[in-house]
């Protein structure tokens, strides 16, 4: 999110607010405001430790969300400073055993739609495959979430399900949030 006024409004609605530091993203930011109520999350794709460390310091990040092929070791180092959210692209063939090597090194998983891009596709995968996830790490649901899915999400059950990641389904255009749509969705 680039519009600081929108960030302040979203902050009142969310527990986490993400800022994308992947330069190839149409949602890329290089400045972030201070947050009082939500945790500030830096979103990265295949970063170096030094790159993330620099952003943690410059932007006072509370958490990082990692969308690439980051190693458990990198996650472990970062977790000494901030919360770590490791993202996995999920499709019908996804092997949830691949998450186990991260269990001790992250705070949350985020299960998103598998695409060649690193999220933000607006496409939904079959969330029923998450019944195959038997791990201990809590997770966020992502992938094509939009207002019309409020009842589906409300009825989604899993013992490790902790929240949802709202992105492209709640934007006028990339990085331009539709605050009214967000408020209405959250109030439901």
Regions from the PLM with identified roles:
Residues 1-188:
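Conserved N-terminal beta1-alpha1 strand-loop-helix module at the mouth
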């Amino acid at each position: 999110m680039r519009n600081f006024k929108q960030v302040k409004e979203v902050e009142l609605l969310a527990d986490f607010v993400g800022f994308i530091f992947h330069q190839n993203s149409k949602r890329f930011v290089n400045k972030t405001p201070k947050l009082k109520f939500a945790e500030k999350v830096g979103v990265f794709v295949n970063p170096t430790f030094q790159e993330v460390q620099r952003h943690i310091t410059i932007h006072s990040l509370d958490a990082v969300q990692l969308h690439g092929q980051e190693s458990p070791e990198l996650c472990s180092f970062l977790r000494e400073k901030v919360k770590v959210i490791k993202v996995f692209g999920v499709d019908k063939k996804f092997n949830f055993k691949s998450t186990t090597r991260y269990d001790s090194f992250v705070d949350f998983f985020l299960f998103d739609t598998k695409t060649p891009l690193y999220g933000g596709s607006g496409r939904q995968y079959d969330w029923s495959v998450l019944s195959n996830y038997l791990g201990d790490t809590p997770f966020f649901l992502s992938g094509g979430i939009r207002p019309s899915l409020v009842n589906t999400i409300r009825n989604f059950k899993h013992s490790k399900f902790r929240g949802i990641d709202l992105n492209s389904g709640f934007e006028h255009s990339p990085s331009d949030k539709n605050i009214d749509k967000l408020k209405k969705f959250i109030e439901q």
